Amino acid sequence: NPGSDWEFCPSDPRTYEVQFDLYLDALEAMPYGKYLHVGGDEITAIGIDDRCKATGKTAFELQMIWLKNVCQFAVDHGRIPIFWDDMPLKYAGIWELALSDKSEEEVVKVWNTDKLDEAIGLFPKECVYMRWKYEDATTPAHRRLLEWYHDKGLKVMGATAASAGDSPFMPRRNTRSEYVKGFSQLVADNQLEGILATAWDDGSPHLETVWRGFIAQGEFGWNPSARDIEAFKKAHAQREYGFRPEDNRM
């Protein structure tokens, strides 16, 4: 796609020459790392060129072929590949549902993983699927999605956001710490591979607006049930700024 600087042709051998060279740079820069982040999210233009059309494969199949190739590269170089999982969910038609806050009764009526079930053989088992949910991860649909991953024996890591593109610079409600706490509890309950906190610069380029979100991830990632949000805010204000509880400046 000439209009895109972040997408690739999975049927072009030169794609892998470029990507693997970039991956090698990353491995050299981080020689003691455990993972290799391969990306793969938010793709809109795979399968549009003549080379891909000639394969007779769908855009989803082409992307999963790419995923298999880059995962093998990661494994061959002693790393665990991480792939952001939105594209398979979009292919299956459950992406918007997974993001929604629909009730359990509403979700039951429309939940359908048939396409994912049929394509399960395309999902590399050595890959960690980064399940990103920047708002409330405890919704019924999202819980069902985590159950699907578990039932299929796939490895999953959670991703929260200390800042996201749709969140203002200031104020950021509780620095999104309730979302961090909720997802961290799900990670513990479902024995996922781990959790991380992203911070997107389109949400704010200023670190002071996201530090409390990072600290919340450290707090609740280790122990999601130790403190409630108000207790966390008070502890943060005392330790980071020296505020006293009676100051009411949390």
List where the protein language model places each region.
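Short acidic/His/Gly/Ser-rich catalytic and metal-binding motifs that mark active-site loops
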Residues: T44-D50
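Substrate-binding/active-site clefts of carbohydrate-active enzymes
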Residues: N1-R14
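Substrate-binding groove of N-acetylhexosamine-processing glycoside hydrolases
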Residues: P13-E28, Y32-L36, E42, K53-M250
